[in-house]
Curated annotation (Swiss-Prot):
Source organism (scientific name): Serratia ficaria
Catalytic activity entry: ATP + H2O + a folded polypeptide = ADP + phosphate + an unfolded polypeptide
Molecular function GO terms recorded: ATP binding; ATP-dependent protein folding chaperone; isomerase activity
EC top class named in words: isomerase
Tagged with keyword Isomerase: yes
HAMAP family: CH60
EC code(s) of this entry: 5.6.1.7
Record-listed ATP binding positions: T30, L31, G32, P33, K51, D87, G88, T89, T90, T91, G415, D495
Subunit structure: Forms a cylinder of 14 subunits composed of two heptameric rings stacked back-to-back. Interacts with the co-chaperonin GroES.
Protein name: Chaperonin GroEL
């Protein structure tokens, strides 16, 4: 086992604080409407330019191992805030730095670290309760656009795009961000259920100009098996031909004789058919087939539940208003499924989301909810260069997370004002002893730090503006963008409550642990082995 380097007490805390400050100082230059960019060098390709706090934090590793431990713990604050709310990473870092700095000063002055931590925790619990009271629901498009604009660093076009996307696919719909091909941002909305499987044969194409298959008011056959024998399909094909409607077959696979016969029937115009593979694999495929069945009021023909393809009737088939299939996607638009049944299915999947343990499973389940509940919107980000594209895409993703958080828990006045109001409301809070009171004061002082940092980044005097804002009430604050005082909510400067709450909770959690640190242990650097220069070769 490698030898260890151990530091105690003040020696350890000073080193740790130095690491915290390096990381926090790099991150906090990005805060607010007049925050600056940070350029990150990459081992290959062009450097990345970003104003996203967590991206900056993730890049920082320090040479001194004790300092690095401090930096890594604050990095954890930014990452946790990012995971919980998708934004607020810089705010969380600024809060953590303030609590740690003030807390360590108090420890150096002889306060009990555990009582300090209890005081900080007490203040945060009270602050979160007050935040909830200040929170205003965020339901209309205008408020959603404002939240998106603020989170995308005052880029109005991004805010409007996100609001438009949410309006079209609903609050539950899937909104994804992709790199576009032009200079302008675009919004593509896919209504209905889309899955990543295309037609099994190009001979099904009936719209050559777009290279796609379009079926109007089709029946939809859902089979959880491979179909290779045409005999199994004949009863259904005959019934559909009599009804004079097209047919979409969604099965594990359609191959051989069955596929050939379907192609021939389609080309001769006897019956209009298209076949696609079912989406997903294994158990997920069964679940997705069931989703399609719910959406189209059909039944999944599965031998597991005793249903045979040969005995399928028109009653077992689903129906939709329209189906569009191209090389690699299928879209089912306006399934005839009963609204209550669809809602029941959505509730069931939501339950699974809560119980899911892996992020991948959770993401896939959320996609399924969106496909059933709303639709899918794709925001295509336009930019002139690759570097700008990456930076802008990261901003749009941040803004999207922020708007989702706003819809979930509501909004509060932005620009650091909400935390100042909360601090004012709980100023009379008392702990069990004097050390806890100091901990409460440390937390209250930290709640001013986001506003102060926004003002510093705007090149103004932080103390003057912080005092002016404290003297006001409600959503009265300072707009660093236009350099004027006023009602933040009326000016459209909003922060999602969830983002502010997460930033405060995670900052206090990690900072509290760091204040109570008394000893740090790390590996000693290995001494370089002496090189063997001058060793003689073998005698000849």
């Amino acid at each position: 086992m490698a030898a260890k380097d151990v530091k105690f007490g003040n020696d350890a805390r000073v080193k740790m604080l130095r690491g915290v400050n390096v990381l926090a100082d790099a991150v906090k230059v990005t805060l607010g409407p007049k925050g600056r960019n940070v350029v990150l060098d990459k081992s290959f390709g062009a450097p990345t330019i970003t104003k996203d706090g967590v991206s900056v934090a993730r890049e920082i590793e320090l040479e001194d191992k004790f300092e690095n431990m401090g930096a890594q713990m604050v990095k954890e604050v930014a990452s946790k805030a990012n995971d919980a709310a998708g934004d607020g990473t810089t705010t969380a870092t600024v809060l953590a730095q303030s609590i740690i700095t003030e807390g360590l000063k108090a420890v150096a002055a002889g306060m009990n670290p555990m009582d300090l931590k209890r005081g900080i925790d007490k203040a945060v619990v009270a602050a979160v309760e007050e935040l909830k009271k200040l929170s205003v629901p965020c339901s209309d498009s205008k408020a959603i656009a404002q939240v998106g604009t603020i989170s995308a660093n005052s880029d109005e076009t991004v805010g409007k795009l996100i609001a438009e996307a949410m309006e079209k696919v609903g609050k539950e719909g899937v909104i994804t961000v992709e790199e576009g091909t032009g200079l302008q941002d675009e919004l593509d909305v896919v209504e209905g259920m889309q899955f990543d499987r295309g037609y099994l044969s190009p001979y099904f194409i009936n719209k050559p100009e777009t290279g796609s298959v379009e079926l109007e008011s089709p029946f939809i056959l859902l089979a959880d098996k491979k179909i290779s024998n045409i005999r199994e399909l004949l009863p259904v094909l005959e019934a559909v031909a009599k009804a004079g409607k097209p047919l979409l077959i969604v099965a594990e696979d359609v191959e051989g004789e069955a596929l050939a016969t379907l192609v021939v029937n389609t080309m001769r115009g006897i019956v209009k058919v298209a076949a696609v593979k079912a989406p997903g694999f294994g158990d997920r495929r069964k679940a997705m087939l069931q989703d399609i069945a719910t959406l189209t009021a059909g039944t999944v023909i599965s031998e597991e539940i005793g249903l045979e393809l040969e005995k399928a009737t028109l009653e077992d088939l689903g129906q939709a208003k329209r189906v569009v299939i191209n090389k690699d996607t299928t879209i089912i638009i306006d399934g005839v499924g009963d609204e209550a049944t669809i809602q029941g299915r959505v509730t069931q999947i939501r339950q699974q989301i809560e119980e899911a343990t892996s992020d991948y499973d959770r993401e896939k389940l959320q996609e399924r909810v969106a496909k059933l509940a709303g639709g899918v919107a794709v925001i295509k980000v336009g930019a002139a260069t690759e570097v700008e594209m990456k930076e802008k895409k990261a901003r749009v993703e941040d803004a999207l997370h922020a708007t989702r958080a706003a819809v979930e828990e509501g909004v509060v006045a932005g620009g650091g004002v909400a935390l100042i109001r909360v601090a004012g409301k709980i100023a009379g809070l008392k702990g069990d002893n004097e050390d806890q009171n100091v901990g409460i004061k440390v937390a209250l002082r930290a709640m001013e730090s986001p506003l102060r940092q926004i003002v510093i980044n705007a090149g103004e005097e932080a103390s003057v503006i912080a005092n002016n804002v404290k003297a006001g009430e409600g959503s009265y604050g300072y707009n660093a963008y236009s350099e004027e005082y006023g009602d933040m909510i009326a000016m459209g400067i909003l922060d999602p409550t969830k983002v502010t709450r997460s930033a405060l909770q995670y900052a206090a959690s990690v900072a509290g642990l760091m204040i109570t640190t008394e000893c740090m242990v790390t590996d000693l650097p290995k001494a370089d082995a002496p090189d063997l220069x001058g060793a003689g070769g073998m005698g000849g």
